[in-house]
């Protein structure tokens, strides 16, 4: 189970979410663990001037509870379209901050497969931490993922500007074979890269909150 938690501070949580529900998230994590929905994985995004100093505390908190933490570079998927690469906390910065408090040993690249996160053993293990460097070290070459949105659209990339409509096909009585063929076509239509570094890059109209996972 994946849960987003960018901060351990309730006030910072409110700044980020405009909701006073930090404790609800913590209670939900505990309930998930009690119900056996393991492993519990947390995703965190560090933002300059907001929570950039929380990396070591977040990792220590997760290690105490047996959660696996993954830091994700902030991507151009915000609803306000205000993403600025110069203000992004990079994977290198994240690792520098963590290395000041923990001994990090990189796991062999052969164990990564198509997973988006690079992983490190923390203080010799068994605890681990992952970093998803979607911007500075993109993993497009090995990506085998697509996403299905809540309104029935298949996206072949988070940064895709087009979608494959499965909802209309379902409502028209398409069988499993036709749906699979449409999805397969979308998968094979994946571009070689997301193109974030290209001058022609266009931020998707859908923010991350409307894409889902």
PLM region spans:
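Radical SAM/AdoMet-radical enzyme domain recognition
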Residues: 1-72
């Amino acid at each position: 189970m994946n849960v987003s938690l960018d901060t351990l501070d309730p006030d910072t949580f409110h700044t980020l979410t405009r909701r006073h529900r930090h404790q609800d998230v913590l209670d939900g994590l505990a309930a998930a663990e009690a119900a056996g929905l393991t492993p519990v994985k947390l995703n965190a995004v560090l933002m300059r001037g907001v929570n950039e100093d929380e990396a070591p505390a977040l990792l220590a908190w997760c290690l105490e509870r047996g959660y696996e933490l993954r830091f994700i570079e902030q991507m151009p998927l915000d609803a306000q379209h205000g993403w600025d690469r110069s203000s992004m906390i990079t994977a290198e910065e994240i690792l520098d901050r963590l290395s000041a408090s923990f001994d990090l040993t990189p796991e062999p690249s052969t164990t990564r497969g198509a997973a988006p996160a690079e992983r490190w053993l923390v203080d010799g293990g068994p605890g681990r931490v992952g970093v998803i460097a979607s911007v500075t070290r993109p993993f497009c070459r090995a990506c085998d993922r697509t996403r299905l949105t809540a309104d029935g659209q298949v996206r072949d990339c988070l940064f895709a500007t087009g979608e494959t409509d499965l909802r209309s096909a379902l409502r028209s009585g398409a069988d499993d074979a036709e749906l699979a063929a449409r999805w397969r076509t979308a998968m094979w239509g994946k571009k070689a890269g997301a193109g974030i570094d290209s001058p022609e890059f266009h931020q998707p109209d859908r923010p991350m909150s409307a894409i889902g996972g």
